[in-house]
From Swiss-Prot:
Sequence similarity: Belongs to the UPF0178 family.
HAMAP family: UPF0178
Transmembrane regions: none
Chain coiled-coil ranges: none
Signal peptide: none
Organism this protein belongs to: Gluconacetobacter diazotrophicus (strain ATCC 49037 / DSM 5601 / CCUG 37298 / CIP 103539 / LMG 7603 / PAl5)
This protein's name: UPF0178 protein GDI0551/Gdia_1457
Length: 154
């Protein structure tokens, strides 16, 4: 059975993920380093890790299995999860899989270097209603694909 892991500390699509998880009956882990409100559901479990750099990321990367779904904007975490066979979605609905993760890592590193040199001083664009809609569609697609792949792997 596929599961969903949310890198929850700064995730703008937690509520949308909860709804999709409930509709599909998927166990969901909401992982953060602080208390985050979650719906009362036997399918949704809050995991509060200790404070520290990448502690939540480490927990997710160690628990995730092939065919699971991870919601995160953290590209290095995404790379770790993809290496374990998981499907990763960022909050804007971009699917980060084996085909896309290399380019995503390269772009992240380039942008980090440009920010460090002062060539880029602005943040990214704001999160929109269209982003939310794209995410919902991508998550539904990821669930269907994950179930098919898990069934084929049996």
């Amino acid at each position: 059975m596929i599961r969903i892991f949310i890198d929850a500390d700064a995730c703008p699509v937690r509520d949308e993920t909860y709804r999709v998880a409930q509709r599909h009956g998927l166990q969901t882990f909401v992982v953060s380093n602080r208390m985050i409100a979650i719906p009362s559901s036997p399918l949704i479990e809050r995991i509060v890790v200790t404070q520290g750099m990448d502690v939540a990321d480490d927990w997710i990367a160690e628990q995730v299995n092939a065919h699971d779904i991870v919601i995160s904007a953290d590209i290095p975490l995404a790379a770790r999860c993809v290496a374990r066979g998981a499907c990763v979605l960022d909050p804007r609905g971009r699917i980060l899989d084996e085909d896309a993760i290399g380019m995503a890592l390269a772009m992240r590193n380039l942008m980090e270097d440009l920010r460090a040199t002062g060539a880029i001083t602005q943040g990214g664009r704001g999160f929109t209603r269209a982003d939310r809609s794209t995410f919902l569609s991508a998550l539904d697609t990821a669930v269907v694909r994950g179930r098919k792949r898990a069934a084929q792997a049996r």
